[in-house]
Regions:
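N-terminal alpha-helical signal peptides/signal-anchor transmembrane segments
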Residues: 18, 31-48
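Periplasmic/extracellular, small/polar-rich flexible segments of pilin-like filament-forming proteins
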Residues: 43-163
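Generic detector of well-ordered secondary structure
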Residues: 9, 17, 36, 115-118
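N-terminal single-pass transmembrane signal-anchor helix
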Residues: 1-23, 27-30
């Protein structure tokens, strides 16, 4: 009886961690898909000016499992029920309007934050957790700063900038 009780307790401890890892992996894949979709959409354009969630939804950039609602009312959300926002930015090397774009992920729990950032940041120009830059332009990811920033809040906003 004691062994069964120990197994049940272990399952309750391990299962949430496995679930968190699976959600983090799925969201890392979604971020890569979104980035690739935006770059493909704007291949022939001179900048990312005009990029919005509406444009991205109409161009089918977001994976279907991320969309809440349908048609023009579809809104991208992540696995944590946080908003996902695409926007043109002026944070590329030239600092020109539309020289870069951002993918913003809201409401990311601390348990998944580090896993998502460490999996995705290498493909981006810069990465922020909240207001903390954890990967500077042309730099490498600061894993210690990422862990500290992610664990500083129960719900995090991640901003990935791509050029």
């Amino acid at each position: 009886m004691g062994i069964i009780a120990a197994l049940v307790v272990a399952a309750f401890i391990v299962y949430p961690k496995v679930q968190a890892s699976q959600r983090a992996q799925a969201e890392s894949n979604n971020i890569a898909t979104i980035q690739a979709g935006v770059k493909a959409l704007y291949t022939s354009a001179s900048s990312f000016t005009g990029l919005t969630n509406t444009v991205a939804v109409q161009a089918k950039i977001f994976p279907d499992n991320m969309l809440s609602g349908s048609g023009t009312a579809a809104k991208p959300i992540n696995a944590f029920k946080g908003n996902v926002t695409l926007a043109a930015a002026a944070t590329g090397p030239s600092s020109a309007t539309g020289s870069s774009f951002t993918i913003t992920y809201d409401n990311v729990p601390a348990a998944e934050c580090v896993k998502i950032v460490t999996a995705a940041a290498g493909n981006f120009y810069t990465t922020k957790v909240g207001s903390k830059v954890v990967k500077a332009a042309d730099g490498t990811l600061d894993v210690a700063a990422t862990a500290a920033a992610c664990n500083n809040a129960t719900s995090n906003t991640l901003v990935f900038t791509s050029i």
